[in-house]
């Protein structure tokens, strides 16, 4: 038997770090198409934001992320790492940043995007799922 975890539902969280506003959105998904559609919806909704960074994991094989103009490795990858550490799959997360005028630096960006993903996951909740072998006798 192999276990995995999935988000219980959609979630939205928000916090401010040095005047930059971070809005985290999380949604359970089952296909890459659903994930890409959600990312497109968030980019359209927050068209005036400086950055709409995203990541998704589907099953054990499909994982993607995007930094949307933030320095490489400071947004999408740290968000993805949150879900990998928690063994969560079938999830898409978009974090929108409205720049507040104060540079956060690479470490500050990494911490802020990770926090936003963690907060959204905590707000959504997580369900344990199991795959059972059909070899019962």
Region annotations inferred by a language model:
Residues 101-102, 106-109:
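Conserved phosphate/anionic-ligand binding catalytic regions in large, soluble enzymes, centered on
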Residues 106, 113-132:
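Long, charge-dense
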Residues 135-136:
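Conserved small/polar residues in nucleotide/adenosyl-binding loops
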Residues 72, 76-84, 109-113:
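Conserved mixed alpha/beta catalytic, RNA-binding, or beta-rich assembly cores of soluble enzyme
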Residues 1-73:
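C-terminal regulatory domains involved in ligand/effector binding and gene-expression control
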Residues 57, 89-99:
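Glycine- and acidic-rich phosphate- and metal-coordinating loops
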Residues 33-40, 44, 81, 111, ...:
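Solvent-exposed alpha-helical segments within well-ordered globular domains of core cellular machineries
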Residues 48-50, 85-88:
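Short, flexible loop/turn motifs enriched in small residues
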């Amino acid at each position: 038997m192999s276990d995995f975890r999935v988000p219980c539902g959609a979630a939205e969280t928000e916090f401010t770090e040095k005047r930059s506003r971070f809005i985290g959105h999380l949604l359970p998904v089952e296909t890459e198409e659903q994930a890409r559609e959600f990312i497109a919806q968030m980019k359209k909704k927050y068209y005036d934001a400086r950055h709409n960074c995203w990541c998704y994991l589907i099953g054990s094989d499909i994982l993607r992320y995007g930094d949307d103009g933030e320095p490489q490795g400071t947004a999408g990858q740290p968000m993805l790492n949150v879900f990998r550490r928690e063994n969560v799959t079938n999830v898409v997360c978009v974090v929108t940043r409205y720049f507040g005028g104060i540079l956060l630096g690479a470490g500050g960006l990494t911490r802020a995007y990770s926090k936003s993903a963690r907060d959204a996951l905590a707000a959504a909740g997580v369900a344990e799922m199991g795959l059972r072998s059909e070899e019962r006798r």
